[in-house]
Amino acid sequence: MKKLSGIGVSDGMALAKAFLVKTPEFAVNKYLKHQLTKAQAKRLLDSAFKKAVKDLEEIKEITVNNINTEAGMIFDAHIQMLNDPTITEQLEQQLAQNVHPVIAVDTVFSQTATMFSQMQDKYFQERAADILDLRQRLLAYLTGQKPHDLVKIKSDVIIVAHDLTPSQTATLNKKYVKGFLTEIGGRTSHAAIMARSLEIPAVVGIKGITTKVKDGQIVGVDGRKGIAGLDLNSKDTTEWKKQKALEEKYQQELKQYTNKETVTLDGHAVVVAANIGNVKDMELACQYNTNGVGLFRTEFLYMNSQEWPDEETQYQAYKAVLEQAHGDLVIIRTLDIGGDKKLNYYEFPHEDNPFLGYRALRLTLDKQDIFKTQLRALLRAADHGQLGIMFPMVATLDELLQAKQLLNQVHQELGGNKQFKLGIMIEIPAAVLAANTLSHHVDFFSIGTNDLIQYSFAADRMNKNVSYLYQPLNPALLKLIYLTIEGGKVNDIWTGMCGEMAGEPLAIPLLLGLGLKEFSMSASSMFKARMIIAKLNYTECQTLAQKALTLANAKEVEKLVEKFFKKKDIFI
């Protein structure tokens, strides 16, 4: 048997014939010479939009009936994207220049998708797939084709594709579709979320899978290990089925860990919370019984707007999430824009290295009117739940004190009677080294490992040439985390983590042993994290973590934790 590795995004195992999905081609360039009147172009584009909206409403209904309401809301977001003022304005500008609607849609949606795909944050990267899904649907109608949905499959198959759009995934019939394998994608893509909701095993990011599999060939999917099995003989098939039975038993065990409360075997309690980017994400997180929100990224409120969002718009969004949390802490990060996250209505200054430049708190401290508007909306929303306000990208005490001064000023303007917690992101090495001092001025720390790793190892994780340096288990990084937690303890404040590392199974016992109090992650990772923590002894994890700090490299740490898990019969 040949095994191909990718990213497991939906647990489970399956074995069936491959159903190869070809990516539609629209020959966009041939429309460069097509001439339409402006009225004809407008009618053609409007018709395509109406058909697309009708499709999405029908797909939403199918999704709600076959999966759940939360999954269906993904298509509300798609309809909102079609109505996004920024996109419609760009399309109108193209038509005004006598550009054919096919070229206009291809240009605007491709550019928007590229903008998202180039962002550092995986959550934002994977929204590019939603934009391309809409592009594909609109181009199909504009060129007289039918969107390629997969509702007609009537035999047991495993889908093999370059990528699956969210709308394709939503219409899969789990009676027949036993799993899927794709060349691109990630854990927080909407297609991955759909797969988990349908409980269909899936592996994405398998390079060249569509060229290595023939239509009708027997293939295997192992969604937990992130493996595709090809060229299976009878012995391989028997073993795969045996492992599948064990996997099904494991999945049933996972479903026992739905309670919010997460406690180790020796009674040490921690919080497992969700990372979200909008109100709809919170609805999905509630399905996983989240214990509050460890990170609410507010960037989408700004990126989905044609101008700086006003106070009322922001207030309504923050209020909605706080109310859904039913008294659990909701940590809302103030605007973290800049670097790779741009706004259509604001021109950032040119910088040779924007990731080390004018972004996040540095920008909002400079644009105080914008900052105060957000702070007012946040403080007003505090009446509707337990609010945590978090400043991103804090490098120095001076920055923190300046931000606090503005917050206190706005608070006094609103009467000074709002209840909230204040925290900062620890994602710059200088902040780690100043943790003892910074902890005097806040209620909590939240470690942003995605940026902390990049800045500590001087390596852009999106750069394939240096991606090997993205090492969450490196002892040097573990020491930075430990310094942060200990720095917080000096002034009796707790430390959480909202980077991807918080949901990484091999990291969990180490983070627990180092003293992390809150683990914030994508909603789909929470059951597994709770299960792992519930099988651990806090005292043993402390010993394990201290041992890890003495090791030489990430590989040694990985082996240490794997041995620890094996001894305790913990399977991940």
Swiss-Prot record:
BP GO annotations: phosphoenolpyruvate-dependent sugar phosphotransferase system
Cofactors required: Mg(2+)
Keyword annotations from UniProtKB, A to Z: Cytoplasm, Kinase, Magnesium, Metal-binding, Phosphotransferase system, Sugar transport, Transferase, Transport
Active site (record annotation): 190 (tele-phosphohistidine intermediate), 498 (proton donor)
Catalytic reaction(s) noted: L-histidyl-[protein] + phosphoenolpyruvate = N(pros)-phospho-L-histidyl-[protein] + pyruvate
Alphabetized NCBIfam families for the sequence: PTS_I_fam
Protein name: Phosphoenolpyruvate-protein phosphotransferase
Originating species: Mycoplasma pneumoniae (strain ATCC 29342 / M129 / Subtype 1)
